[in-house]
Amino acid sequence: MDFKIAVLAGDGIGPEISVQGVDVMSAVCEKFGHKVSYEYAICGADAIDKVGDPFPEETYEVCKNADAVLFSAVGDPKFDNDPTAKVRPEQGLLAMRKKLGLFANIRPVQTFKCLIHKSPLRAELVENADFICIRELTGGMYFGEKYQDNDKAYDTNYYTRPEIERILKVAFEYAMKRRKHLTVVDKANVLASSRLWRQIAQEMAPNYPEVTTDYMFVDNAAMKMIQEPAFFDVMVTENTFGDILTDEGSVISGSMGLLPSASTGESTPVFEPIHGSWPQAKGLNIANPLAQILSVAMLFEYFDCKEEGALIRKAVDASLDENVRTPEIQVADGAKYGTKEVGQWIVDYIKKA
């Protein structure tokens, strides 16, 4: 298979972890006889500094013409600390999602046995946690009509039937591939938009008779995720709720540096770690590259290259078992490994496998 990959390293630690993801992808492609080419493009604060736009048209063209985007992270404190800034790095991420029609964010939540002690939850609660959060990405309050003056402000949580149907279809199909349990998260007791979500989900559920579908208010779901994370298999929800719940779910594993994600939809899919740009660690060779590397595994799996994805996951598991880890997840007496060293260890493992 031939892969044409757009690489958007972004800001902060992005360029460092991006290199590790590319190196792993190249090693796997060589191992399995695939051809791969990369085209690099700017985004985020880096793009604002260079051209004044966090997602310039040239970057969009690169992404649009690729088979997949390997994205790292955007964000810079100089924008976070300036409330008057009209253009911000995160706007580039929203623009990419909108322009590429990326309406579904797929975020796995799982634990690694050797790192269960890193979770803030008790081991017996998280040891069997393995679920997927599916978040609608291009509708709701983040994209609805907005207004603000000195005395009032509002954001509109606007959704249409086609927007809801397409994300629910993704969720039901994921549930069919897994343990056949789907939880639809909403606030239907208060919000009209949530009542439409629930109505449409109830209409679609009979088309998937093998899937057990249940419905949960978002506040209850937030509690259930902490009290009994193993209850969930596939969870689907709207944009704002999903933004909050996916971050809550990310702490279950014990480190945001372990979790990848995918955003899919009408055009080129995007694969990225869930963590941010961590500008304080830029250039220090301490950032955990595993989420970026596991994003490459998700990329291969998206294209039905299951053996390739499985090999990457096996290599990551082996690195953790051998205590080849960056500082934030290393054992007390473990050797010191940096971003580059962890990435190279995984590349070497893949080549020898």
Curated annotation (Swiss-Prot):
Amino-acid positions noted as binding Mg(2+) in the UniProt annotation, renumbered to this chain: 219, 243, 247
Q: What does the record give as its pathway?
A: Amino-acid biosynthesis; L-leucine biosynthesis; L-leucine from 3-methyl-2-oxobutanoate: step 3/4
Write down the chemical reaction(s) this protein catalyses: (2R,3S)-3-isopropylmalate + NAD(+) = 4-methyl-2-oxopentanoate + CO2 + NADH
Q: Which domain of life is it from?
A: Bacteria
Kindly list the residues the record flags as site (Important for catalysis): 142, 187
Cross-referenced SMART domains: Iso_dh (SM01329)
**UniProt cross-references to PROSITE patterns, sorted A to Z:** IDH_IMDH (PS00470)
Binding of substrate occurs at 97, 107, 135, 219
Q: Does the keyword Cell inner membrane apply?
A: no
A GO CC term assigned to this protein in UniProt:
cytosol
Q: What does this protein's record comment on cofactor binding?
A: Binds 1 Mg(2+) or Mn(2+) ion per subunit.
Q: Which residues form a coiled coil?
A: none
**UniProt entry tagged with the keyword Acyltransferase:** no
Cofactor requirements of the protein:
Mg(2+); Mn(2+)
Q: EC no.? A: 1.1.1.85
Where does the UniProt entry say this protein principally localizes? cytoplasm
Q: Where in the cell is it found?
A: Cytoplasm
User: What does this chain do?
Assistant: Catalyzes the oxidation of 3-carboxy-2-hydroxy-4-methylpentanoate (3-isopropylmalate) to 3-carboxy-4-methyl-2-oxopentanoate. The product decarboxylates to 4-methyl-2 oxopentanoate.
Q: Which family does it belong to?
A: Belongs to the isocitrate and isopropylmalate dehydrogenases family. LeuB type 1 subfamily.
Q: Assembly and interactions?
A: Homodimer.
Q: What protein am I looking at?
A: 3-isopropylmalate dehydrogenase
Q: Which organism is it from?
A: Bacteroides thetaiotaomicron (strain ATCC 29148 / DSM 2079 / JCM 5827 / CCUG 10774 / NCTC 10582 / VPI-5482 / E50)
User: Which gene holds the coding sequence for this protein?
Assistant: leuB
